[in-house]
């Protein structure tokens, strides 16, 4: 039959209220805040009756230490007490008030309101899940690289590798081979057939493609321009001058040349007067006026210089004068 013992929270309250352990006191009893002396034995040295009396009392209460049967081990007592405090759901550490250094190091805790039954169940299930996850991590960490390599070397591969391929792919491959027609082997002959490419010879230039042609010159009757019309007038005048017969005459002691056949000089120049005729709106009006001006100039000129000009006169050098129609 198991021995029943007091839980840690009521046992701790009883130890604080007894004032038998030095340093274990209430800081704020209303808020259930208390402190525990937490001196480091390795740095400052321990006094079992003073610094480790709370941890020893808890070891005696849990049955892990009995006076006279085991050697005292204050470090183990302190570690067991710390684990028990951290596992309590209704006690938490106030870290901003704790002092972890020096000979007067203390830890401050707060007692929370008691948990209900449902809260205790949730807390228990959470702790069990944490324990399982820790165990899994520990088992994974224990496996060394040597054991992993040994497992790989001991594993044997099967001789039949057909199971590695996908069955569907093999079926598709068989269907494709069935649909593909069988190719007959190609026979290579040493004789090659004669073949040629028809080549059409094209001349280098386009002169052979078209016959040489000369454009006909335009006839004089078809290609008449204004310049040709102007050139005809002097030619006609020259012909008239060549056909006409120039006759010297003397009027009032002045010599003149007359080319009107059948007309006596006296009858012509006796009644000759320099009267301006009215302008005739005809194509030969300008020519008539020009001839009249020429005769007027000849009449007014001195006849003595004509004697020197009669012998060397050259008709082609005479200025062309348009005649009246």
UniProtKB/Swiss-Prot annotation:
Position(s), cross-link Glycyl lysine isopeptide (Lys-Gly) (interchain with G-Cter in SUMO): 275, 299
* Residue range(s) of DNA binding per entry: 5-113
The superkingdom of the source organism is Eukaryota
Summarize what the UniProt record says about post-translational modification: Phosphorylated by CK2 and this positively regulates its activity. Sumoylation represses the transcriptional activity and displays enhanced resistance to protein degradation. Sumoylated by UBE2I/UBC9 and SUMO1. Inactivates the tumor suppressor activity. Elevated levels in tumor cells. Major site is Lys-275. Sumoylation is enhanced by PIAS3. Desumoylated by SENP1 in tumor cells and appears to compete with ubiquitination on C-terminal sites.
- Which keywords annotate this record? Acetylation, Activator, Antiviral defense, Cytoplasm, Disease variant, DNA-binding, Immunity, Innate immunity, Isopeptide bond, Nucleus, Phosphoprotein, Repressor, Transcription, Transcription regulation, Tumor suppressor, Ubl conjugation
* Disease annotated for this entry: Gastric cancer: A malignant disease which starts in the stomach, can spread to the esophagus or the small intestine, and can extend through the stomach wall to nearby lymph nodes and organs. It also can metastasize to other parts of the body. The term gastric cancer or gastric carcinoma refers to adenocarcinoma of the stomach that accounts for most of all gastric malignant tumors. Two main histologic types are recognized, diffuse type and intestinal type carcinomas. Diffuse tumors are poorly differentiated infiltrating lesions, resulting in thickening of the stomach.
The record's misc note reads:
Deletion or rearrangement of IRF1 are found in preleukemic myelodysplastic syndrome (MDS) and acute myelogenous leukemia (AML).
Q: What is this protein called?
A: Interferon regulatory factor 1
Q: Which gene holds the coding sequence for this protein? A: IRF1
